[in-house]
Curated annotation (Swiss-Prot):
Gene: pyrE
Oligomer status and interactors: Homodimer.
Highest taxon of source: Bacteria
Species of provenance: Cereibacter sphaeroides (strain KD131 / KCTC 12085) (Rhodobacter sphaeroides)
PANTHER family: OROTATE PHOSPHORIBOSYLTRANSFERASE, URIDINE 5'-MONOPHOSPHATE SYNTHASE
Gene Ontology biological process terms from the UniProt entry: 'de novo' UMP biosynthetic process; pyrimidine nucleobase biosynthetic process
Coiled coil feature spans: none
Assigned EC number: 2.4.2.10
Molecular function (Gene Ontology), one example: magnesium ion binding
Protein name: Orotate phosphoribosyltransferase
Length: 232
């Protein structure tokens, strides 16, 4: 069912952050930092994949995503909804259902047998495709999915995510340079504000998280493992 009411962006961001905290998808651990895929340390970690196990929350968030897209991209802006393998697939299916549109998904790489395709489902030349993912940090993985979509002759000018880190200033520019507009529901700053309001974390932890969010590169550089070759 297509949504017909449009909550303010600030309220969507606040409620999204609250739900992520409620299901304990948010983790703050400044004393024992997590290791990101890049190998760099981070005091924060978020697991949006948990959302699929909470029907009321996932339904509300998909309503939020649908109204965000209708308001910001247009009511007739898309012909196909594509999920990025693998975390984006369930969310793409839920958004496609709400918007009454076909759904496909994009592999990270060809599976190496059969059709050896990156696109699964029916995507045709000229279709306007929305890419759906669970989150984005610097936007890099989104561009690979967008390129795979465009190789079919379809267009892809928009990507929607539940969570956007919002701390790496180059992200939006990288996507825009590729002709892609990002539509997130909330960022780390929204989560930090809601975490403060909830009282779920101590002041020292929140201060360290804010230090990281304000200048992630410096925070990471100060905590990177020493290069053993430099002592030789």
């Amino acid at each position: 069912m297509i949504p017909t009411s449009f909550p303010p962006r600030e309220e969507i961001a606040r409620l999204t952050a609250r739900m992520l905290l409620e299901i304990e998808a948010v983790h703050f651990r400044p004393q024992e930092p997590f290791t990101l895929a890049s190998g760099l340390p981070s005091p924060t970690y978020i697991d949006c994949r948990k959302l699929i196990s909470y029907p009321r929350i996932r339904s509300t968030l998909m309503d939020f995503m649908a109204v965000t897209l209708l308001r910001d991209a247009g009511f007739e802006a898309f012909d196909n909804i594509a999920g990025g393998e693998t975390a984006g697939i369930p969310f793409a299916a839920l958004v496609a259902e709400r918007l009454g549109l076909p759904m496909t998904y994009v592999r990270k790489k060809p599976k190496g047998y059969g059709r050896n395709a990156r696109i699964e489902g029916v995507m045709t030349e000229g279709q306007r495709v929305l890419l759906v993912e669970d989150l984005t940090t610097d936007g890099g993985s989104k561009l690979s999915f967008v390129d795979a979509i465009r190789e079919t002759g379809a267009s892809c000018a928009h990507t929607a995510v539940i969570f956007y880190y919002g701390i790496f200033p180059e992200t939006i520019g990288r996507l825009q340079a590729h002709g892609v507009t990002l539509h997130p529901l909330c960022t780390w700053w929204d989560v930090l504000a809601e975490a403060r309001a909830s009282g779920a974390f101590d002041a020292a932890t929140l201060a360290e998280v804010e230090s990281f969010l304000s200048n992630p590169r410096d925070w990471q550089d100060a905590r990177k493992p020493a290069d053993p070759t430099k002592s030789l």
